């Protein structure tokens, strides 16, 4: 079946055809078989010929009436057609005629862009007059060309300064056409051939619009939607290095956040908006793909990043050559430089050959150069490199601004050029070296006062030409100077405003003097930042001020002036952009709000907890008892119950310093000199309104708190300045002081060690100090500036102490573990043997050993505690809380069953202690019983221990399991796994036996072991719906999602019983508390137990041998 490939480029080029008949189609047919189209295909745009007997027919040689001819006639011309098309597609493969060579360019362009329409019709035997050959290729009607652009090379791409229209003749120039990759095609059935051919116009085709791919690329780069506001400054960064240096991956990682191993030998030019300290900047990145740096690149950059590969000595050695070559065209001593070593290619097969010390040594040889090592694969230090480059560019501009301000404040003088110094200049200092070919340097007496528009547009201005050339080009007569120029002259302090400041570096001299004086390098020469815009970062201004650079008032007052007449060497788009609209794609309505929030977040810090109260307090030194001084500290109180202090605010701002810290959960606060902590705050006194607040009036005391020093009474009316207006004026507050008492030792010490730096008068009652004491008796004694400040700190710290203690109580109350109620605990006494002590038989038993499963008296409980919790875990029946797993163990064992196991070998001559026995006798018996295990029941012989262990778990036989565990099974035996990797703890969790799982956990069963499917015991407890087992395992230290599949995210979503994985392959299943299997487990009497324990060496357990 013939296939038609529709190469639709209209969607790609965004060009709509005039009619549907012009849609380009290509037909590929095979003369051998319609079922083998894959053997005869032509791949356009790839210069590749595949297939054997393939014919591609020219639509100009076909007619509608030839559709009915026999297909054999078409096959007869295959050989000739194939040869002719091969010659057209590959003109260099043979000696072609002149006419064929002329047509070859058209055919290649047509082939690469799929602008030729082909249809499946039979060839016509017509002959045209004047044709050179019967089979001469007649090109199809070409697509009408759009107005062709004259590409003028700039530093950042192309600019369409002039537009021309192409002719509609068939000999349209396609020299500027760049082949594009072949897009995806659509396969249509052969039935659509006739319909497509009827839509094809037989007359003269109308001209179609054709646009070169470079047009769309430039339109994307220079689009208004991708331009920022005119007030956004540009920062031009150059990236240089060899093709093996990894610079392409570095730039790609910074722009896209992804890694690409492919290197781009031709380089690239990119834009990105960066925000530094809340200010937006447009970063222009130029990846220089050439091995040799040219003049234009060296004069364009504001900073350079030299990139080398730490695995390549060649790329490392090329850095010095590149720096030396750049020094010919640019003074790099004042140019920000960054040396980057990429570690992307380090692997086992390719080791590192350039050490970090060698890289830093090379950076030290290059002045003003920082060194970084990056990894584009993981993104290490990539953002830091470009941020450092941006900061260095801004610092350089600050220095240029300071130099301009200093030059403007100095006395103006007319510059006198000195041409005799040109012999000693370097290349970058020669102004006549970097003039474009479109202009020439005129003698000083022949230069016009104002450069023409064409001169300004076509001249490439470089940094080296300003000191001597630009001053002549910008010296107009005073009568013809514009208002903007006069204002700029007044700002700069020069008669014509054209003398360059002495402090301007060559990297800044490319900009106009107006931009330098203003301190902002704007993307638009007609826009300058006003005085309200923070063009310079605050930290940079501080650094410049500290370095000794004066910031004059003239430099601070920025003047807005129009500089549209000045040339723009490298901005994008061209200089006519001042009349274009400004896109708001980067400036939304809430941009200012987002910027303010960003600044606030930066000021707050990243990753730092915000204190609820902070400030300066005096702290008494506690290092030496002889020399205790008051030192000023910066104290912070946090909401998580922490109190910290730092030496000063600077240390607090440093994120690496944590200061001294105290946990308030274990602390209390009190006022210095008082026995008890302060629970109520001092309340200001109120004066009786009947007395009018006079000196004879007696104030009413609302709240009074006795002090240790308040022992005696003072002479007079018993008050200390109670209603005196002078006292109120002195203290600036109404405050009632209790009756003054004789001074104590604490008051005397306080007066002797009064802090330095306060000018207010203090009496003995105004005690602004307080203490914070923790459980380790560590004292922090602070002193505030006033009583009000002291009370605020006491209230805040006391509130945090209360809150911390409340959280602990709430955590204990909101524990998710199920706790047994009192009736269930009381029911433990009804278990056989629990009515008396398991060791001495005392009927008054209020304590229990939960891991042994016995109830004991209070005296025996003390002895059990001395044994250690690894042997006996003692709990009170009435005092402690009982989780359900502890209660389940107690219900499963009991005193009688436990004594049958622990006193199994008790000899007739051994006497068990009674309640009246001495403590020493009880201690000796309990030690032999539980520590030495002298009477313990041994393990049954004849069967592997691990097999008995799994049999006991599957049978829910707690006592058999207890015997095995008490006889001292090793950790390896307890954690023995089956063929699918499950342990006995997995089995206990799958059957929902919380008592068995708890006993295994107490005997060092590893709950973190996963089976062969990566599932933990939590998975089996959750999948079978055993919530108690799940909570017990989480309490044992497992994470709630440990060893669980991702689709299981909530316990409440799981069914009550759901067996997954290898559970279906077992020969048993569970349903509630029942156990069913293919072979029932023998529940008969226990086997005969030998006199001694038998523990043979056991191999790994096979689960099938247990059941």
Curated annotation (Swiss-Prot):
First and last residues of every ANK repeat: 980-1009, 1013-1042
Phenotype caused by lack of the gene: RNAi-mediated knockdown in a ced-3 n2436 mutant background results in the production of extra A/PVM neurons; the precursor Q.pp, which is normally fated to die, acquires the fate of its sister Q.pa.
Compositional bias annotation for Low complexity: 159-171, 467-491, 560-573
PROSITE patterns cross-referenced by the UniProt entry: ANK_REP_REGION, ANK_REPEAT, ARFGAP, GLD, PH_DOMAIN
Arf-GAP domain residues: 822-943
SMART domains: ANK, ArfGap, PH, RAB, RAS, RHO
InterPro entries, alphabetized: Ankyrin_rpt (IPR002110), Ankyrin_rpt-contain_sf (IPR036770), Arf-GAP_GTPase_ANK_PH (IPR051282), ARFGAP/RecO (IPR037278), ArfGAP_dom (IPR001164), ArfGAP_dom_sf (IPR038508), P-loop_NTPase (IPR027417), PH-like_dom_sf (IPR011993)
Its biological purpose: GTPase-activating protein for the ADP ribosylation factor family. During neurogenesis, involved in cell autonomous neuroblast asymmetric divisions that generate one precursor cell and one apoptotic cell probably by controlling endocytosis. In oocytes, involved in vitellogenin vit-2 uptake by regulating receptor rme-2 endocytosis.
Protein name (database record): Arf-GAP with ANK repeat and PH domain-containing protein cnt-2
Lineage of the species this protein comes from: Eukaryota, Metazoa, Ecdysozoa, Nematoda, Chromadorea
């Amino acid at each position: 079946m013939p296939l038609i490939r529709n190469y639709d480029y209209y969607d790609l080029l965004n060009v709509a055809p005039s009619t549907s008949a012009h849609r380009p189609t290509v037909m590929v047919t095979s003369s051998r078989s319609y079922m083998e189209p894959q053997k005869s295909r032509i791949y356009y745009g790839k210069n590749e010929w595949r297939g054997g007997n393939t014919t591609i027919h020219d639509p100009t040689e076909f007619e509608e009436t030839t559709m009915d001819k026999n297909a054999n006639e078409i096959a007869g011309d295959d050989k000739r057609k194939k040869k002719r098309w091969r010659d057209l597609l590959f003109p260099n493969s043979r000696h072609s005629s002149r006419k064929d060579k002329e047509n070859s360019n058209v055919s290649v362009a047509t082939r690469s862009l799929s602008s030729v329409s082909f249809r499946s019709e039979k060839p016509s035997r017509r002959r045209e007059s004047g044709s050179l050959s019967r089979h001469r290729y007649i090109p199809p009607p070409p697509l009408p060309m759009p107005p062709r652009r004259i590409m003028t090379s700039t530093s950042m791409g192309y600019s369409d300064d002039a537009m021309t229209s192409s002719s509609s003749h068939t000999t349209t120039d396609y020299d500027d056409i760049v082949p594009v990759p072949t897009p995806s095609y659509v396969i249509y059935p052969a039935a659509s051939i006739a319909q497509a051919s009827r839509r094809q116009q037989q007359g003269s085709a109308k001209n179609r619009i054709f646009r070169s791919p470079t047009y769309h690329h430039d339109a994307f780069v220079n689009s208004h939607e991708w331009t920022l506001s005119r007030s956004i400054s540009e920062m031009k960064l150059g990236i240089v290095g060899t093709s093996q240096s990894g610079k392409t991956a570095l730039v790609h990682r910074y722009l896209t956040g992804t890694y690409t191993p492919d290197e781009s030998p031709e380089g690239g030019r990119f834009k990105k908006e960066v925000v530094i300290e809340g200010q937006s900047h447009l970063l222009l990145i130029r990846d220089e793909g050439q091995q040799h740096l040219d003049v234009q690149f060296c004069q364009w950059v504001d900073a350079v990043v030299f990139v080398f590969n730490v695995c390549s000595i060649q790329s490392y050695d090329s850095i010095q050559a590149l720096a030396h070559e750049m020094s010919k065209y640019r003074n790099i001593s004042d140019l920000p430089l960054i040396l980057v070593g990429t570690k992307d290619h380090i692997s086992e097969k390719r080791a590192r050959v350039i050490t970090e010390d060698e890289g830093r040594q090379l950076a030290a040889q290059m002045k003003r150069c920082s060194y970084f090592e990056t990894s584009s694969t993981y993104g290490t230090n990539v953002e830091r490199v470009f941020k450092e480059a941006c900061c260095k560019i801004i610092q350089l501009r600050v220095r240029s601004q300071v130099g301009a301000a200093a030059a403007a404040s100095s006395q103006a003088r007319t510059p006198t050029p000195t041409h005799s110094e040109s012999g000693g200049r370097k290349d970058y200092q020669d102004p006549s070296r970097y003039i474009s070919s479109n202009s020439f340097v005129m003698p000083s007496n022949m230069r016009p006062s104002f450069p023409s528009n064409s001169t300004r547009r076509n001249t490439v201005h470089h940094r080296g030409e300003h000191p001597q050339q630009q001053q002549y080009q910008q010296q107009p007569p005073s009568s013809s100077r514009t208002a903007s120029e006069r204002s700029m002259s007044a700002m700069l302090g020069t008669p014509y405003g054209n003398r360059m400041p002495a402090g301007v570096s060559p990297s800044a001299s490319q900009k106009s003097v107006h931009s330098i004086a203003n301190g902002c390098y704007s993307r638009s020469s007609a826009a300058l930042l006003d005085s309200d815009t923070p063009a310079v970062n605050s930290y940079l201004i501080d650094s410049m001020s500290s370095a000794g650079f004066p910031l004059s008032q003239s430099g601070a007052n920025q003047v807005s002036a129009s500089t549209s007449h000045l040339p723009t060497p490298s901005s994008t788009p061209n200089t006519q952009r001042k009349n274009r609209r400004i896109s708001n794609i980067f400036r939304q309505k809430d941009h200012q709000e987002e910027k303010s929030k960003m600044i606030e977040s930066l000021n707050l810090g990243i990753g730092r907890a915000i204190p609820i109260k902070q400030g300066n307090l005096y702290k008494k030194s506690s290092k030496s008892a002889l020399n205790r001084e008051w030192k000023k500290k910066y104290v912070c109180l946090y909401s998580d119950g922490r109190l910290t202090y730092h030496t000063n605010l600077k240390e607090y701002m440093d994120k690496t310093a944590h200061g001294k810290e105290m946990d308030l959960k274990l602390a209390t606060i009190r006022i210095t000199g008082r026995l008890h902590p302060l629970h109520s705050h001092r309340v200001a006194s109120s004066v009786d309104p009947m007395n009018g607040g006079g000196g004879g009036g007696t104030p009413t005391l609302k709240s009074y708190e006795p002090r240790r020093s308040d022992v005696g009474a003072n002479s007079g009316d018993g008050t200390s300045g109670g209603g005196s207006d002078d006292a109120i004026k002195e203290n600036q507050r109404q405050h009632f002081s209790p009756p003054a008492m004789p001074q104590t030792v604490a008051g005397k010490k306080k007066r002797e060690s009064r802090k330095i730096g306060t000018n207010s008068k203090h009496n003995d009652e105004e005690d602004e100090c307080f203490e914070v004491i923790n459980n380790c008796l560590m004292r922090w004694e602070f002193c505030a500036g006033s009583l009000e400040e002291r009370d605020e700190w006491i209230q805040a710290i006391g509130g945090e102490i209360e809150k911390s203690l409340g959280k602990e109580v709430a955590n204990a109350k909101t524990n998710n573990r199920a706790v047994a109620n009192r009736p269930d605990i009381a029911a433990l006494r009804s278990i056989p043997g629990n009515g008396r002590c398991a060791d001495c038989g005392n009927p008054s038993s209020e304590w229990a050993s939960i891991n042994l499963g016995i109830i004991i008296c209070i005296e025996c409980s003390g002895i059990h505690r001395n044994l250690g919790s690894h042997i006996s875990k003692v709990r009170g029946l009435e005092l402690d809380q009982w989780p359900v797993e502890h209660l389940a163990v107690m219900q499963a064992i009991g005193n009688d069953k436990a004594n049958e196991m622990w006193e199994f070998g008790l000899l007739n001559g051994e006497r068990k202690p009674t309640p009246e026995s001495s403590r020493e006798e009880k201690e000796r018996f309990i030690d032999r019983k539980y520590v030495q295990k002298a009477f313990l029941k041994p393990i049954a012989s004849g069967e592997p221990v691990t097999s008995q262990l799994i049999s006991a778990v599957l049978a829910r036989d707690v006592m058999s399991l207890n015997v095995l565990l008490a006889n001292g099974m090793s950790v390896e035996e307890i954690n023995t796994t089956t063929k699918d990797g499950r342990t006995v703890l997995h089995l206990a969790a799958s059957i929902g036996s919380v008592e068995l799982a708890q006993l295994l956990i107490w005997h060092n069963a590893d709950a973190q072991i996963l089976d062969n499917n990566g599932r933990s015991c939590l998975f089996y407890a959750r999948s079978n719906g055993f919530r108690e087992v799940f909570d017990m395992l989480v309490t044992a230290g497992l994470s709630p999602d440990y060893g669980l599949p991702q689709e299981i995210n909530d316990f409440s979503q799981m069914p009550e019983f759901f067996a997954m994985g290898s559970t279906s392959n077992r020969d048993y299943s569970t349903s509630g508390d029942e156990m069913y299997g293919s072979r029932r487990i023998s529940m008969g009497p226990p086997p005969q137990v030998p006199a001694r324990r038998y523990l043979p060496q056991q191999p790994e357990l096979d689960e099938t041998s247990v059941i």
